[in-house]
Amino acid sequence: MAELNTHVNIKEKIYAVRSVVPNKSNNEIVLVLQQFDFNVDKAVQAFVDGSAIQVLKEWNMTGKKKNNKRKRSKSKQHQGNKDAKDKVERPEVGPLQPQAPLVQNGHMNGCEKDSSSPDSTREKLALTPREKKISILEEPPRAQRGVTEGGRLLQQKMSLDGNPRAIHGPSERSDGPQWSAGQPCNPSKPKAKTSPVKSNAPAAHLEIKPDELAKKRGPNIEKSVKDLQRCTVSLTRYRVMIKEEVDSSVKKIKAAFAELHNCIIDKEVSLMAEMDKVKEEAMDILTARQKKAEELKRLTDLASQMAEMQLAELRAEIKHFVSERKYDEELGKAARFSCDIEQLKAQILICGEITHPKNSYSSRTPCSSLLPLLNTHAVASGKQGNFARKSSGHNKPSEGKAANPKMVSGLANTADACHQTMPTNKQQNGPSSQRRRFNPQYHNRLNGPAKSQGGGNEADPMAKSNSRHEHRRQPHNGFRPKNKGGAKNQEAPLGTKAPEAPPHSEKARRRQHAADNLEARPFRGNVSRVSQCNLCPSRIEVSTEATVLSVPAVTLVA
């Protein structure tokens, strides 16, 4: 009983340490507690300080070269999968729990029957988990030679998760000895029962190994993908920035040249005003000179009345006036605009500067290992494009096939329209004597085999008149050199000879039906169906329509 309480205390200590350090496994906590004589405070301090790693290495945990971050991630993954593993382990641990007392008694076959009291049974159950723990703690040095770290951690978790179940419920404590007492001696059963546990470890190791590799590889590629995504988003932002910068630069250019334009206009206005002032000043000077010249001219007119002294002064005045002629020339050249346009052009050309983008990026080609992937991706995309084009090409003939019935129905509709317009055109086809002169003979020849069926065919003169009307409408449109052979072949089964129509009736028909070209064309399609229907009494009307098409062709050729 004391041993059971001791085990319960150990379990409580494990839970106490785990509450402070949740990312550590039970096996690691037990190892550190054993190192510090099951002192919870020292164990927690060791986990916090990081000295627990050295302690675990001392417990033959060599080969564990991973940092704390990797331990935390793995422990979180193990905690996430703990419930699923417990469900898988419960059916396997259940049958193994009753065998634990038999193994601990030193008898592997379990042949001895335990008839002791319940207290002894509880003591055996209490001893069982501790001895199992000690055996598990001693197993890693032997097992890690051929098993990787993932499989070893899974085996340790399975053993530690299986131990508390043997202690919890009173039903398990009481059922275990009863089952062992009631079982017969069978030395092969314990081996068969313990073998599944050994075989499950490699399987679990094989299942975990790809996941671990993916998780080792995953964070790196995820970080790269995130960096690539950020860079792509920033490219879009820079594109917007370039557009905004260009727009602002265009506005600045327009503003600068608008200011220059305004300055030029202002300068032009000022120069024009100054030129006006110069013109006025020059004109005033010339006006004064003109007045002085006129005054001297009047004095010269009075020279006959002057004395010698006055004449001498007049000559001096005229000489002085004439000597200032050079100033007149300078005055005429002074009113001139001068500007150094070339210098101004040079200043305008160097005015303003635009910085071009620098392509400082490296022209790095993809690695040789990535080129095959890119080529296969390009080939796959090309195949998909070809398949899409082929599928669209396959759909087009079906559309064409679907359009053909529409064309046939359109021909039929035009034929019906022509039949409906025939009675109205009968009044415009000339005198009825011409129709009687030609149609009765033709009617008697074609309807000869139809008379044996009684008066049924005589009751539809409208249909026959329609066929005669079609015969009159056909000569101009239906005549083509290609139809000569077909028309003669269609006349052969009838065994009849087409009579020559009177010339005046033919001319009348040509005048009457010159405007019906488009309505008569749809009936050419009936020629191919006539040869099959000539001998059918029930379809004599169709055959007459078809044979009527051939008669004018022979008539026109003759």
Curated annotation (Swiss-Prot):
Ranges of Polar residues composition bias in the record: 421-433
Annotated spans, Disordered: 63-204, 385-406, 421-514
Transmembrane segments: none
UniProt keywords, alphabetically: Acetylation, Coiled coil, Cytoplasm, Nucleus, Phosphoprotein
Pfam families listed in its UniProt record: SPATS2-like (PF07139)
Compositionally biased spans, kind Basic and acidic residues: 80-92, 110-142
Coiled coil: 279-344
Subcellular compartments: Cytoplasm; Nucleus, Nucleolus
Modification N-acetylalanine, positions: 2
Residues with the Phosphoserine modification: 120
Record-given protein name: SPATS2-like protein
